[in-house]
């Protein structure tokens, strides 16, 4: 069955973006927009689409959760042995995208990615809820085939016996954080009549950022 959505459209009229009034640092604007999304009760505003591409030149995308905005990029945590981890090992160029329909906004981040310090990953892992720590050990490897859900549940329950509530769960060597160092970041604000505002920050050789407006 085919479906036709060609007549479905909305008029975006909730905001505007002026190149003359934005801060020099894209991270300052990212923080401002993120805080506004939180205040407007956007559901999981820190959820972002992460696009990777390995040596096979086949792109893949999935949702991951932003956990930190640094002075040079953004940090998330995952399984290093996952499909995304394999892509990253072969090609460090990635893109991330936030889309907040409630605010009619997008943020597109392009950059290079690398593992963060293992001690920092371990510190974050130990802050996670106990069952989330245990669950991380079930995915060996993440995206690997499993016979059925019962096998997963049995592994999880056995791990909970091995590491009961209150016991320290070791940080897996295959699990940790990545930081995307931003080379370019685009802020998109929906406008009426498809005349959207698009401002892109580009990182220069000296580490500063220049800005320009893009056609919608």
From Swiss-Prot:
Annotated PROSITE patterns: PYRIDOX_OXIDASE
Residues involved in substrate binding: 9-12, 67, 124, 128, 132, 194-196
Gene3D superfamilies documented for this protein: Electron Transport, Fmn-binding Protein, Chain A
Protein name: Pyridoxine/pyridoxamine 5'-phosphate oxidase
Textual note on the cofactor: Binds 1 FMN per subunit.
Required cofactor(s): FMN
A GO BP entry: pyridoxine biosynthetic process
Family: Belongs to the pyridoxamine 5'-phosphate oxidase family.
Binding site residues for FMN: 62-67, 77-78, 84, 106, 142-143, 188, 198
Pathway: Cofactor metabolism; pyridoxal 5'-phosphate salvage; pyridoxal 5'-phosphate from pyridoxamine 5'-phosphate: step 1/1; Cofactor metabolism; pyridoxal 5'-phosphate salvage; pyridoxal 5'-phosphate from pyridoxine 5'-phosphate: step 1/1
UniProt keyword terms in alphabetical order: Flavoprotein, FMN, Oxidoreductase, Pyridoxine biosynthesis
Organism lineage string: Bacteria, Pseudomonadati, Pseudomonadota, Gammaproteobacteria, Moraxellales
Subunit composition and interactions: Homodimer.
EC number assigned by the record: 1.4.3.5
InterPro entries noted in UniProt: Pyridox_Oxase (IPR000659), Pyridox_Oxase_CS (IPR019740), Pyridox_Oxase_N (IPR011576), Pyridoxamine_oxidase_dimer_C (IPR019576), Split_barrel_FMN-bd (IPR012349)
Enzyme class: oxidoreductase
Catalytic reaction(s) noted: pyridoxamine 5'-phosphate + O2 + H2O = pyridoxal 5'-phosphate + H2O2 + NH4(+); pyridoxine 5'-phosphate + O2 = pyridoxal 5'-phosphate + H2O2
GO MF annotation terms: FMN binding; pyridoxamine phosphate oxidase activity
Annotated function: Catalyzes the oxidation of either pyridoxine 5'-phosphate (PNP) or pyridoxamine 5'-phosphate (PMP) into pyridoxal 5'-phosphate (PLP).
NCBIfam families hit by this protein: pdxH, PRK05679.1
